[in-house]
Amino acid sequence: MLNRRHLRIKILQVLFGYYQDEERDVVRARKALDHSTMKMKELYLMLLDMVASMQGLAIDRIEAGYKKKLPSPEDLNPNTKFVTNKPLRVLANSKNLRKACESTGVGWANRQELLRAIFKGMLDNEEYQEYMAIEERGFQFDRESLVRMFRKHMVNFDLFQDMLEEESIFWVDDLDLAASMAIKTIKTIKEGDEDVELLPLWRDDDDDKAFMEGLF
């Protein structure tokens, strides 16, 4: 969720634009602030959806191996450790995440090439290769490994960061907080969970939202 420091930064950004504008339209400035915070939520959902999408791409890769005219022994007996990662499966099958993405219009439908590039890069990533190579399993180990792959590869993938700069002026500044929220969400997944609980943009008592409106 948004913290006070991040809120102050957003407010200062909007106020700078407000005082640069000769008309100094308060209503428009408030809308800009609301838009900025909503983009933060969209980025958070996009990051979780990116992680969830990795499972489908991994499954596609395994199925493509089976269909080769001359499949290798690895193609015929693939390592399924990643696709059966339990926290990843919870994310991939999450109704809460799917509903939130649909309601906000967030998704990767128009960015499939980038998504595949992130996945292919992950296959060469040290964290992924170490995870696939060792025999250790267990829910906590799977969850910690997924977080490391996300933090050290997915969110830092160069083409992904380039996309953020092109898509929204807010996302580059929001990335660190959105990524920490995504990691916190993954860490809340417990063994036996059938769905993931998404973090709210504001605290339950709504103090932060009132704080933002009061400062502005």
Question: Model-flagged regions — what are they?
Answer:
Residues 1-216:
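Class I Rossmann-like S-adenosyl-L-methionine
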